UniProtKB/Swiss-Prot annotation:
The keyword Cell cycle appears for this protein: yes
Localization: Cytoplasm
Pathway annotation: Cell wall biogenesis; peptidoglycan biosynthesis
Protein name: UDP-N-acetylmuramate--L-alanine ligase
Family: Belongs to the MurCDEF family.
Organism lineage string: Bacteria, Bacillati, Bacillota, Bacilli, Lactobacillales
Biological process terms in GO annotation: cell division; cell wall organization; peptidoglycan biosynthetic process; regulation of cell shape
UniProt keyword terms in alphabetical order: ATP-binding, Cell cycle, Cell division, Cell shape, Cell wall biogenesis/degradation, Cytoplasm, Ligase, Nucleotide-binding, Peptidoglycan synthesis
Species of the source: Lactiplantibacillus plantarum (strain ATCC BAA-793 / NCIMB 8826 / WCFS1) (Lactobacillus plantarum)
Residues holding ATP: 111-117
Catalysed reactions, as listed in the record: UDP-N-acetyl-alpha-D-muramate + L-alanine + ATP = UDP-N-acetyl-alpha-D-muramoyl-L-alanine + ADP + phosphate + H(+)
Record's function text: Cell wall formation.
UniProt KW Cell division keyword: yes
SUPFAM superfamilies cross-referenced by the UniProt entry: MurCD N-terminal domain, MurD-like peptide ligases, catalytic domain, MurD-like peptide ligases, peptide-binding domain
Amino acid sequence: MDKATVYYFVGIKGSGMSSLALILHDKGYQVEGSDIEQYTFTQKGLAAAGIKMLPFSEDNIREGLTVIAGNSFTDDHPEIKKAREMGLPVYRYHEFLGKLMEGFTSIGVAGTHGKTSTTGLLSHVLSHIAPTSYLIGDGTGKGTPDARFFVFEADEYRRHFVAYHPDYAIMTNVDFDHPDYYKDLADVQSAFQQFGNQVKKGIFAWGDDESLRHLDVDTPIYYYGTNDRDDFQAVNIKRTTKGSSFEVKYHDESLGKFEIPLFGEHNVLNSTAVIAVSYFEKVNLDEIRRELLDFSGVKRRFSEHQVGDMVMIDDYAHHPSEIKATLDAARQKYPDKEILAVFQPHTFSRTKALMDGFAASLSKADHVFLTNIFSSAREKSGDVSSKDLAAKLPNGGEIITTDDMSALTAYHNAVAVFMGAGDIQKYEKIYEDQMK
């Protein structure tokens, strides 16, 4: 690491990129970067830190920069191309992160779903007990001087996580996703196998996931879950409108009762994983208990507020399993209210590949509203539409647009759960303005 260079992020508003930029800034390095001019929720933290954000332009590239390129951008991007032509050091995000974690007790959180929530929970618990640096996929990052732990989100997309060799890994689940890259579930499984082989001290894996049960690695694997065969077992689970409580057993030893102000079974599982890895690092159980009780969640994961007589929940869910978990959490907290699912399908390839799963998960809501499919930078069009998904829903689904939300605004004293990984917040803003 070089204090003389300026670390320049191409795509600085990306969720992982903004987190990494904040870590380097906290550690006293010079940081700036470029991105689209449209506002994204990650830039709030960058602006608060005084980090310069520029529009994309090859004129930004100059001598003295070390370029960190976001994974969404190809080598043909004008800034990356110019940096290479000038002979500047250029790293991909995952390559640089792999270098950064050396010298800490590193804990990577991997899984098709639940990465960000679990990384956020683990970061919260450890950082209030011991010096901890962390990188969360919601745009939050912190670089702590003399940190003992480095907690980070390990993304399976395009096998980026194989750049990492952490001490520990939490693996929340393995599911088929990213159909623009992975061929099938077996392809995803092979990526997790490859990552698992690089973990040094221990893997903490969800025991109900058959793919994780079949991991074949030399590193010890400790399973967590709610069954007797799990090494770390959550028992006596109680779910109320205030949160969840449970006891954790490690084999025959009770680690005591824990309470979380969180909803949905997935949060009990995520918490059990956090307790397990912390226990192995000999973190005091009473301190873990205290910090779990104080966790308020991460950005865009079941973020809620009131608008008139409506409860609005904003969530990043964009896969059938995530939608199911989010709606389950909404039912736990609001058992007596109607649940309205407002979903923006993310990419044509994912919508087509997981169509039946989306229909099954969305049907857990009382009413479903769909926006048009959000296209990514890599994929502008496809042969499927939101109307195809609406037709698969047992009770149908209504298509809403930014110009016409009348079908949604007709509801009152209910819970509107907005879900998606694209620009669903644009719809939320319009809805909110109309409901005020």
